[in-house]
Structures are given as structure tokens and as C-alpha cells.
Amino acid sequence: MSKHIVILGAGYGGVLSALTVRKHYTKEQARVTVVNKYPTHQIITELHRLAAGNVSEKAVAMPLEKLFKGKDIDLKIAEVSSFSVDKKEVALADGSTLTYDALVVGLGSVTAYFGIPGLEENSMVLKSAADANKVFQHVEDRVREYSKTKNEADATILIGGGGLTGVELVGELADIMPNLAKKYGVDHKEIKLKLVEAGPKILPVLPDDLIERATASLEKRGVEFLTGLPVTNVEGNVIDLKDGSKVVANTFVWTGGVQGNPLVGESGLEVNRGRATVNDFLQSTSHEDVFVAGDSAVYFGPDGRPYPPTAQIAWQMGELIGYNLFAYLEGKTLETFKPVNSGTLASLGRKDAVAIIGANSTPLKGLPASLMKEASNVRYLTHIKGLFSLAY
């Protein structure tokens, strides 16, 4: 009897699960259904470039139909309303219901606002290609407006959060600002680019010397860092910081935190802080017919600490899940997850970057790190046969 595998989410984990399981099952042996909110697979690690207008949307959002062409994968573009792992049912926003023999949950994360009053209502985010387009359009509109009104709030751009997303976004904006300002007859030095971070330093995943290098590189291009200053309240365009100071900014992009998709916590799966706990085979610890990938999962390393929810980990999870789905449904031996951390890369605009690479965490900076960042994207796209996106 044909098995039915349902995959929720077409991020890194979902796409790799779908492509990999098809290497082991013919369409007669198993139906594979992928459900995704958007018709595209979005390269989340490159969204900052789209948010600064530095690449076309087609370079970071690939049509799933094209990726899955000839793979016998049923694609449903729909939002998941809920899923119940006890009933083995998935309810979609269009009113339809799916049942499954095995389920993959790859629903990613949602923005965390930490209960800060007014933050969600008064900030933009960078979680999708649509968000990135909105940020770029908004920044350009404000610069244009500033050229007419000289309202300082229009000339102030605040990024909340000094992790990879926030730093990479501010780096891209610093790069484009001279030309964007010039386009509207504005002196780019009048545009204030600020980044606020609750912790004592930006990019805490990197060693101190690379953090200093990144800070200096961005400060040289006009970025002001406000570290050790949690946002406490947001009202309209006024952002209050812990030391009592205020930033008045008509552009505020919040990248300061993510949390598991709430649907995961409501599904009946065993969770830890909103993410599903998994065993060494990436099966849910409570439901062996459910596999979990990427930001939806929490996987603890040998040191007892959870692995960071990165794209490279999600990609590796997806590949293993693709095989383990087959092994589970056929009663074969499942393989254990052995993640390889190939490093952390932070771009600082177009021509600069900092990185630690490989098992020995070799530091890289400047052009070599930039090229490595580019290469890691190309490597991923080649892997999923998505190189056509680079034609744009």
C-alpha cells in the first residue's frame, strides 16, 4: 500500500526532506505532499540583500514548482491552521484536511517580541521576501520624504538586534546609503543608521577580535551602535531604551529574536520552550511518526546545549530526515544525526565580512570572508539544483 508523507514548510529542512526522500521512494511506493505558505523557497540568509535592493527577488525566492519539477512531489500552497499528531491530521486554512503515515514539521520560527509594549505594532521584520521588499520600499520612501521635509525622524533608521540578521542588514543599508541619498539630493551623512542591542556586544557567536573588526568596519561607514541597551517600550516612532534615552525613528526594523512557531506547541508534540524535542534520529520524542527539522526542532548536542537554529543545521536535518522517513516506514535501521558546523559567516555589506570557518574555527575577515559567504550560498543552491536563481 502506498504511504503518504506530508511535509509542513518548504524552508531548508522541508525542501531537503522532500528532495531526499524521493531518492528512496518511487511515486508508486509513497506520495509526498509539501505544504507551504508561499509558492517560493526563500533563502532566508540572503534576505538582507533584498532589503537593501542589492539583488532581485528571484535570487532569494525560488519557485517551488521549478525546484520540485519532475520529482513527483505534490505541492500545496496553503497556510497550516493547525495539526494534531494524535489524530494524524493537518488542517489547512482553505478548509481542507490532510492525513499522513509520516509527518515532517519544518514550520520555521516566528519573531519574538519578548512582551515589550508597542514593539510588534510599531516595527517591521525581516522574515520573508515580502518583508524585505517592504523594508527597502519604506527606507527609500523615508529618504525621499526627508529630502522635502528635513524631518530628522525620516533620516533615522534603527535596527533592533545585533545578531546576524541585524548586523547584515545594517551593513547592506550602509553600503547603499550614499547612492540612495544622492538620488534624492540628500547628503548621506545626514542619514543616521543606528543598531540597538540588549546584550553587551554584537555578533556574540563570534570571537571578540572579529566583533571589534565588524564594529570598526560598520562605524567607519556611519553606523552607530547602542549596545547593552534593551528596548523597553515603543510608542509610534519613539523607541525607549533602558538607560532612559529615546530614539525617534520613522524606520524601525526588529530582528532581535525568534521563537518556535506556535502551531508546534499546540500540536500535541512534546516541546521545550516552544520547539519540538527530537531524538538522535530527528523523530519527535513523543511521536515516532513525526520528524522535525530546522527552527521547529530543538536538538541537544553532547554538551547538553541546543544546536543554534541555523540554515546549515536545517539543511543537514532535512537530508537525514529524507532517509529516515524511508527507514522508519520500511522498518529499516534509522541513521543518527551527526551535524557538521562548517562555520559562521557575517557579511558587512557588499565587500566586507567576518567569519569563523571549519572545525578549528579559523577566523576570516575582509574579502576572503565575503567570498566564503558567497560560496556558501552557491554551494547550497547547487545542492538543491537552484542555480537558475543566480541567473537573475
Curated annotation (Swiss-Prot):
Source organism, top-level taxon: Bacteria
Record-level Gene Ontology MF annotations: oxidoreductase activity
Keyword Flavoprotein: yes
InterPro entries: FAD/NAD-bd_sf, FAD/NAD-binding_dom, NADH-Q_oxidoreductase
Protein EC: 1.6.99.-
SUPFAM superfamilies reported for this sequence: FAD/NAD(P)-binding domain
Pfam hit, one: Pyr_redox_2
Keywords of this entry: FAD, Flavoprotein, Oxidoreductase
Entry cofactors: FAD
Inducing stimuli: By glucose starvation.
Positions of disulphide bridges: none
Entry keyword annotation includes Oxidoreductase: yes
Family according to the record: Belongs to the NADH dehydrogenase family.
Entry protein name: NADH dehydrogenase-like protein YjlD
Organism this protein belongs to: Bacillus subtilis (strain 168)
Lineage: Bacteria, Bacillati, Bacillota, Bacilli, Bacillales
